[in-house]
Amino acid sequence: MQVSVETTQGLGRRLSITVPADTIKQAIKKELINAAKSVRIDGFRKGHVPMNIVEQRYGASVRQDVLGDAMQRSFVDAIIKEKINPAGAPNYVPGEYKEGEDFTFAVEFEVYPEVELKGLDGIEVEKPVVEVNDADVDTMLDTLRKQQATWKETDRAAQAEDRVTVDFSGSIDGEEFEGGKASDFVLAMGQGRMIPGFEEGLVGHKAGEEFTIDVNFPEDYHAENLKGKAAKFAIVLKKVEERELPELTEEFIKRFGVADGSTEGLRAEVRKNMERELKGAVRNRIKTQAIDGLVSANEIDVPAALIDGEVDVLRRQAAQRFGGNEKQALELPRELFEEQAKRRVVVGLLLGEVISTNDLKADEDRVKTLIEEMASAYEDPSEVVEFYSKNKELMNNMRNVALEEQAVEALLAKAKVTEKATTFSELMNQTQQA
């Protein structure tokens, strides 16, 4: 077998492979003999069909199968011989086959980039230093009460966290625009659902009032024709409702799994959940900074085949989230996912090199700890731990999580890490915006 390697462009490679004529001849002969043992042709007993008839009837398809198999086998042998690491599926370009002559074909593919890590000592990471205090617990309890609140109609003027029912009609330069009109629109204020200035314009008005508010669409608004535009909204305020918070009664507290229904028990349970959430947020904040620094310091070429594969993964995940099927997933625009897909591939390649360079293996004690931490959020943690231990795929997924954490720790060992005091709410807001 003869092999030549050509670099086409960037990570692209083209192998030209020649398979000796005798190798093809013997393979075709072997397959025809095997076929002759099982074919049925009228006038002949099974296994006694003359070889010339077998070849006449099945020769073309056998040759096609043999050539396809020869290309695949020869490609594998060639990349092993040339020490090439292909990325993605290869594209076979068959040559013309002539009986008695060597068979030459080409294979086009991409290779993984050679990654040489640099700039690790220049990575800067701020480690959040924060504790859950009593005020944080109070705030969370207020949030829980708000989530369980009821609404009561009031005749006073609307306030910042009321719920209102309105009719509105938006216009720009006197012309109404698409999507700018609604009737009996129910809005729980204070959640940032509307553009800046809209909710503020409702505050101070009572049910039954009709008025106009002036707003400006943000420069980064999703609708291109509205970005940065000044608009007027004609408002009819139909109803104002105020939130009625439930008291921390024994019955209310037991809804959250606190068996004794005590305020102290609820506070302890809330604090435990907040501390678990905080631990994960700190971990993710540090990890994000370390990986961002790694990516910034190491610009690498990325095989298009890997990006294509990751785009398909993201498409399917998006379709599943919204109840779509395989066909609908593939119809989602590629540009929605391409940037994220490329970053995921880059991060995977760079972290893979960190793991390889540091000869890292998943720490089973860490894997166990990660599973226990995750299970602690469920009603029966031991049942979740047992479920994981019996599921090979889930265990391997958790080993990958542990290995990624170990790779991040290897980065942090060389990075410039400084501590920064912050609060629970600040850190959680940063996490939600990331």
Curated annotation (Swiss-Prot):
This protein's name: Trigger factor
Gene3D superfamilies assigned: 3.10.50.40, Trigger factor ribosome-binding domain, Trigger factor, C-terminal domain
Catalysed reaction equations from the record: [protein]-peptidylproline (omega=180) = [protein]-peptidylproline (omega=0)
Family the UniProt entry places it in: Belongs to the FKBP-type PPIase family. Tig subfamily.
Domain PPIase FKBP-type: 161-246
Gene responsible for this protein: tig
One MF term in the entry's GO annotations: ribosome binding
Physiological role: Involved in protein export. Acts as a chaperone by maintaining the newly synthesized protein in an open conformation. Functions as a peptidyl-prolyl cis-trans isomerase.
